[in-house]
Structure formats: C-alpha cells, structure tokens
C-alpha cells in the first residue's frame, strides 16, 4: 500500500480522473517505499486542461491587477502557513533533507510569488507623441494559456517560479511536474484555488515526456517554460516552433566553473566549493563542478575541502541533523556511479567517496558518498559532461587568461563563480566568463529579484526578475489620430 494513495489530475479547480486508464508509481528515494500511484494524463485530458485554462484565463485577465495581486499574496500566506507540511512532503518525494526543504524550497517559492504579486500592478504601457494631433500608446496584454514543464530537483519551487510571473501578468498555466517528483505541484494547485485563483487558471497534468510533448505541440498554448536537460530542451524548442511558433523559456543544464585565485581566503573558498557541489546531494543545475584552483594553493585548498567533506552528515532525510540525502531515483544513482567509474578509468585521482552507501538504513535508498576527484583534465568525461550528482572535479591553473579560456570551453553557460580578494580581478574575470548567472565570493543564491538563465546551450530566456514578467506579456501598439485623415487616393 502506498503512503499517499492514488493521485489524480487537477483541472478546473479540483481533482479529476484521467481518461488514459494508466498510472505510474513514485517512490521515496531514501527507503524505496511506494509513495503514490499517479494517474497519467491522456491527450484528451491535456485538451480538457487547456480548455479549462482558456475559460479561467478570461476571468483572471478581466480582474484588475490589484485584485490579482491580492489573491497571489493570499497564496503566499497559505504557502508559509503550510511550510512544514509541504516540506515534509517534498522531503519524502525528493529525498532532500528536511532541514533543507524547511528552509529553502517552499520559502523561496513563496518569495517569488510575493515578488510578482507586488509587480502585477506595475505592468504599464507607453505613450509616444508623434505630432501635435497624433500619438501612439502601447498595452502589455497577457499571452493567454502557458505551459510549464518542471524538473525533479526542485518540484514546488520550480512550479512557483513558473506560475508567479505568468499569473501576475494575467495568464493561465497548465503545469506538468516531473513524473519522478509529482506530488507537491498538486498541493500548490490546492493553495491557489483556496486563495481565490479562478478555476482553470492553474491546472496540473501528470505523466512522462509524452504529456510534455502534447503541451508543447498544442496550438492553443502561447508559451512554454521548461526546466530540464539540454537534449530535451532542444526537442521542446523544435516542437514549439514547428507547432505554432510559440514562445519558449528554457533553463537547461550546466557544467559551471568555480575559479579559486591564489589570493583567495582558503576557508571561504573551500566552504563555497563544498556548497557548490554537495548541496541537495549535488542535484542542482548551477553546481560549480569544475573547480579551477591556482597551482600554488591547490594542495592546501584540497586539504580543506576534504576536511569539510568528512563533516557532511549523510543520513535519513527526515532526521533534522542530516544535511546530505539520497539521489532522487535508482536511475539517477546508476548514472552518477557510471560517471564515477569513468573518472577512475580516465585517470582522475579519487580523493573522497566514489561508492554507493548500502549499510544499515542506507540499504534500500539511492545513496552515493560525496565524491571528490583530483588530478582532473579538461578532456575527461567527468569534467565535460553534466553529472547532476555529488561529484567534484578539481583542476589546477596558472594564469588568469588560461583559466578563463578553459572555463569557457564548453557548450554550457549556466553559471560561474570566482573567489578572490582582488575585486578588480573578480569583476574583470566575471565579465569575460560566458555564463548567465555569476557569483563573486559566494555561490548558489537565486533571489526573486535576480534574473536567472543560461548562455549558449544552457537555456533561452530568464526566470525571476522584472524582465521575466515582461516576457509573459505581448505588446499591442495603437496609433490615435486626432486631426484630419489625409487619404492616399
């Protein structure tokens, strides 16, 4: 018997049964326990969700911006009131430590909704004078029905990130969470309904990539916001364009460089590197997995990193003291272990971890020890490809120009960071790095006010920040003639 029972679709302000007759299972990655059976959406269900969203969107867009703002603020209040309950669910579904989900996942998701609730009333057009008796004005109008496709590493946070600007601008959204972590998006739907969001404005359809493809290719979807891998992102972009030239926002993979210069505070640098590789068991798209360290300090830096890795508390995610949990699934565990074996085979020096943890309460979970490789080269698979797990690669460098060139030698461009006491060098280096999200002497924070997204094959568009709100609107230009019309013929 499952912990949470049968999970249905959420369409039109309530739960409905899928018509496919199919279900899939979701498991607790720490214990292997069956959490729920989830109904898979059919093409007819996707059509129903979009039709419901169209109806709800008309009502939602007809409200004043202040009315929408108040409703979204109420949703924020409900999220914060239920933080502990939602964090417990997210921990069971993802395997993240409860200390992490309590402090980050729902908290930051609510912050983003609050941010856009505040901006809803600031959506404005322009007035452009042409001459004494004629002018142009513009309106920013909602796109209509948007699709959100989430990833498995931050299920409820991603759902908040995608819905907040869309709803603030007067759109509706049909959201498909990852089939690996499908539970918390349904709770967000309940909260939106309770807060007063009209029925249909936020619908949740469940299923695998085929359901995402139905959304992406649907002619009545105006925009797709996708978070996931590069190859899937390319398919999303292709289908979105081929179907109806719909707009896309995509936050894709990364293989981000962290550069530690020779004047860095080594304790600070080691703390940053460990956070940038092992937070959330390394399952973060912006992880700084390519750690470039100046040759003169590499040994001392490496020692400090290893000291900190020994202090990581791997354990049951539900224990308050745990700060490192399992990987999200058996498939992800196999993938990460495969990369570790590749690192060994290509000559990287294993300095810590490198094994699956199977003793005691780890036996049925998807645990891999925090792993550090030294003596890495740029051409190694573990250095070039996204692992999405707790595997750090340490590389040495000698000059600023050299490390910048090597850091940029990738088709990814999501994030980058530098650690140095020389702020001139910090800014100079950051300005030359080909990455959309950069940090100086820190790592990982992505507040609501900060636009996040990638360069190159790490994404298209941005999430969070004022710019994102604008991209959930379309501009209508209107010329007004107050004087005499001069006919052409």
From Swiss-Prot:
Query: Which GO terms fall under molecular function for this chain's record?
Result: betaine-aldehyde dehydrogenase (NAD+) activity; metal ion binding
Active site per UniProt? 162 (charge relay system), 251 (proton acceptor), 285 (nucleophile), 463 (charge relay system)
Residues under site feature: Seems to be a necessary countercharge to the potassium cations: 247
> What detail does the entry give on cofactor binding?
Binds 2 potassium ions per subunit.
Protein residues bound to K(+) 1? 26, 93, 180
- List ligand-binding residues for K(+) 2: 245, 456, 459
Q: Which pathway does this polypeptide act in?
A: Amine and polyamine biosynthesis; betaine biosynthesis via choline pathway; betaine from betaine aldehyde: step 1/1
User: Which Gene3D superfamilies does the UniProt entry name for this protein?
Assistant: Aldehyde Dehydrogenase, Chain A, domain 1, Aldehyde Dehydrogenase, Chain A, domain 2
- The superkingdom of the source organism is Bacteria
Give the required cofactors. Answer: K(+)
The catalytic activity of this protein is classed by the Enzyme Commission as 1.2.1.8
| Keywords, comma-separated and alphabetical | Metal-binding, NAD, NADP, Oxidation, Oxidoreductase, Potassium
Q: Which residues bind NAD(+)?
A: 150-152, 176-179, 229-232, 253, 285, 386
Task: State the Pfam families in the record.
Answer: Aldedh (PF00171)
GO-annotated biological processes: glycine betaine biosynthetic process from choline
Task: List the catalytic activities from the record.
Answer: betaine aldehyde + NAD(+) + H2O = glycine betaine + NADH + 2 H(+)
Which enzyme type, at the first EC level? oxidoreductase
Residues with PTM Cysteine sulfenic acid (-SOH): 285
Q: Which residues cross the membrane?
A: none
Q: Does the record bear Glycosyltransferase in its keywords?
A: no
Q: How does it assemble?
A: Dimer of dimers.
- Main function: Involved in the biosynthesis of the osmoprotectant glycine betaine. Catalyzes the irreversible oxidation of betaine aldehyde to the corresponding acid.
Q: Which family does it belong to?
A: Belongs to the aldehyde dehydrogenase family.
Name under which the protein is recorded: Betaine aldehyde dehydrogenase
What is the scientific name of the source organism?
Burkholderia multivorans (strain ATCC 17616 / 249)
């Amino acid at each position: 018997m499952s912990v949470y029972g049968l999970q249905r679709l959420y369409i039109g302000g309530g739960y409905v049964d899928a018509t496919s007759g199919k279900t899939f299972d979701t498991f607790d990655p720490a214990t292997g326990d069956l959490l729920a059976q989830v109904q898979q959406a059919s093409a007819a269900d996707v059509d129903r969700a979009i039709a419901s969203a169209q109806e709800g969107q008309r009502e939602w867009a007809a409200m004043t911006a202040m009315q929408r703002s108040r409703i979204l603020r109420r949703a924020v209040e409900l999220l914060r009131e239920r933080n502990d309950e939602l964090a417990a669910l997210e921990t069971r579904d993802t395997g993240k430590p409860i200390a992490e989900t309590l402090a980050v996942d729902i908290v930051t998701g609510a912050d983003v909704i609050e941010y856009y609730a505040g901006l809803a009333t600031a959506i404005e057009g322009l007035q452009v004078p042409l001459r004494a008796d004629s002018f142009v004005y513009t309106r920013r109008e909602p796109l209509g029905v948007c699709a959100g496709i989430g990833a498995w590493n931050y299920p409820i946070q991603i759902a908040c990130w995608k819905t907040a600007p869309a709803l603030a601008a007067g759109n509706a959204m049909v959201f498909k969470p990852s089939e690996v972590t499908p539970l918390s998006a349904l709770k967000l739907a309940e909260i939106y309904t309770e807060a007063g969001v009209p029925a249909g404005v936020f619908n949740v359809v469940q299923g695998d990539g085929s359901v995402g493809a139905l959304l992406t290719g649907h002619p009545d979807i105006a925009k797709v916001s996708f978070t996931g891998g590069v190859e899937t992102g390319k398919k999303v972009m292709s289908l979105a364009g081929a179907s109806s030239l719909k707009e896309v926002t995509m936050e894709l993979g990364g293989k981000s460089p962290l550069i530690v210069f020779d004047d860095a505070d080594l304790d600070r640098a080691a703390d940053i590197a460990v956070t940038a590789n092992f937070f959330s068991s390394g399952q973060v798209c912006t992880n700084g997995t390519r750690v470039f360290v100046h040759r003169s300090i590499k040994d001392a830096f490496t020692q400090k990193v290893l000291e900190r890795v020994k202090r990581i508390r791997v354990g049951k995610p539900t224990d308050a003291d745990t700060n490192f949990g399992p990987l999200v699934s058996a498939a992800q565990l196999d993938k990460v272990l495969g990369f570790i074996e590749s690192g060994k085979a290509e000559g990287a020096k294993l300095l810590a971890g490198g094994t699956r943890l199977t003793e005691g309460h780890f036996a049925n979970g998807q645990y891999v020890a925090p792993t550090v490789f030294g003596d890495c080269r740029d051409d190694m698979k573990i250095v070039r490809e996204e692992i999405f797990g707790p595997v750090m690669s340490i590389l040495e460098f000698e000059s600023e120009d050299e490390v910048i060139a090597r850091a940029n030698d990738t088709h990814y461009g999501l994030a980058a960071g530098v650690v140095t006491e020389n702020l001139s060098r910090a800014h100079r280096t950051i300005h030359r790095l080909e990455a959309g999200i950069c940090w100086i002497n820190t790592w990982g924070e992505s507040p609501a006010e900060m636009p996040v997204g990638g360069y190159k094959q790490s994404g298209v568009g941005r999430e969070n920040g004022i710019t994102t709100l604008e991209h959930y609107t379309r501009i209508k230009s209107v010329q007004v003639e107050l004087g005499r019309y001069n006919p052409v013929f």
